[in-house]
C-alpha cells in the first residue's frame, strides 16, 4: 500500500484489520478467515510477564516446532541468552521485533503489516522479505523501505487524493506505469498550452518560449515511445 504521508495508509490497514470501522462502504472476508495485524505501536500492548521465547510460544500457531521458533527468533536478532530475556526489560526496538514475529507466526490467512521494517537492519529487512515470499496467505503492508517493497510486493495499492488505484505487478512495474501516466499528463498539458491561443500566441510569446515548449513536447513524445 503506497501513498504520501497523511493519505490514509494506516487508516486503510487498521480498517481492513477490524481495529476501526470503515468511514464509508464495507468489506467482507470469507467465513473462517483469520487476520493478524502489526502496527508501529502494537508492541505497546505487550504486558505479559513472559520471556521472549515463552511469549512467542503462546502466540505462535500450534504445530510450529521448537527449533523453528529458535530459527525465527535468530532471524529477528534474538539469539543466545536474548531468547530468555524477560519482556519487561526489552527495548522499544526489541519489543517491536517480537510483536512483528508474533503476528507472523500466527500463520493467519491475512497478514496486515504497517511499517514492519522500522526497527530492522538491512540484512534483517532482506531476510524478512524473502521469508514472507513463501507466506501461505495474503499480505497487506506499507513500508518506506524500497528494498522490502521491491522484494515482496506483487500488487500495488496506491492511495492518492482520497482515491485508491490498483496496479498489478511488482514495485518496479508500478514505478514504470506511474511515470508513464505522468508523462502522458504532461504531454496533454503541453499540447493544451501549445494550441490554446489564449495562453500561447504568436503575439504574446517570444520565439524562445515557443521553442522551449516544442522541445519539451518532443522530449515527452520520445519518452512515451520508449516506454511503450
Name each model feature, range by range.
Residues 1-228:
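ABC ATP-binding cassette signature C-motif
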Amino acid at each position: 500500500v503506497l501513498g504520501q504521508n497523511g493519505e490514509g495508509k494506516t487508516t486503510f490497514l487498521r480498517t481492513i484489520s477490524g481495529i476501526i470501522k470503515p468511514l464509508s462502504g464495507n468489506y467482507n472476508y470469507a467465513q473462517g478467515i483469520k487476520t493478524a495485524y502489526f502496527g508501529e505501536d502494537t508492541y505497546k500492548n505487550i504486558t505479559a510477564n513472559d520471556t521472549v521465547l515463552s511469549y512467542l510460544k503462546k502466540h505462535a500457531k500450534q504445530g510450529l516446532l521448537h527449533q523453528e521458533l529458535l530459527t525465527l527468533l535468530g532471524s529477528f536478532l534474538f539469539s543466545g541468552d536474548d531468547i530468555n530475556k524477560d519482556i519487561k526489560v526489552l527495548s522499544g526496538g526489541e519489543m517491536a521485533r517480537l510483536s512483528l514475529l508474533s503476528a507472523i507466526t500466527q500463520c493467519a490467512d491475512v497478514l496486515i503489516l504497517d511499517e514492519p521494517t522500522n526497527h530492522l537492519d538491512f540484512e534483517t529487512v532482506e531476510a524478512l522479505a524473502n521469508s514472507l515470499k513463501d507466506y501461505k496467505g495474503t499480505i497487506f503492508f506499507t513500508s518506506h523501505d524500497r528494498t522490502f517493497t521491491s522484494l515482496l510486493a506483487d500488487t500495488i495499492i496506491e492511495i492518492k487524493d482520497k482515491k485508491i488505484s490498483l496496479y498489478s505487478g511488482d514495485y518496479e512495474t508500478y514505478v514504470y506505469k506511474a511515470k508513464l501516466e505522468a508523462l502522458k499528463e504532461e504531454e496533454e498539458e503541453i499540447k493544451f498550452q501549445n494550441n490554446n491561443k489564449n495562453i500561447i500566441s504568436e503575439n504574446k510569446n517570444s520565439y524562445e518560449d515557443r521553442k522551449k515548449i516544442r522541445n519539451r513536447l518532443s522530449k515527452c513524445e520520445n519518452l512515451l515511445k520508449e516506454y511503450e
